[in-house]
Amino acid sequence: IDIIQNIPLLHPIEVFDNIRLIHELDIGALKLVSAADRGTQKDFGDLLLLCGLYSLERLHSELLKRESMFTGKEFGTIFNVEGLPSGLARDLSALGNFNRATDRKSESNRLILTESATIPRSWPELDQRWTGMVEAYARSKGLRFSPPSRKRKWKNKGLGL
């Protein structure tokens, strides 16, 4: 089974034990788009792991390079049928939208880390580290970063809430 399907890549595919693997830099660029679009806990966790290997600046640069080469309907994929740019060239605000990431009803939105994980094991700490990283990068490059306000979940604690 080949799981790499019609996604244009910047880097050669690596083969390990007869399994084709997408290069980490291609994954990083695609994860930025995924985090901006759907923003699951797994997306943000994966990005923090990738930023342990490559800087956020490098991943963002790879994304911009991808979008300069692969924009248009002929480069559409199952994730982006029209092949449109992500909108992350000058505005990184979508990378701070955690409103969907806190919805734990969906199994695909849960990040379960092992004891040896190199990223924060609590969601609030992971959220804070990622936001700080994006904010610092945006400021250093003169990019916009103004994430939407967070949805507040009120719990009934007998106080009329």
Language model features: what each stretch is:
Residues I1-G39, G45, G52-L161:
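Structured mid-to-C-terminal alpha-helical surface segments
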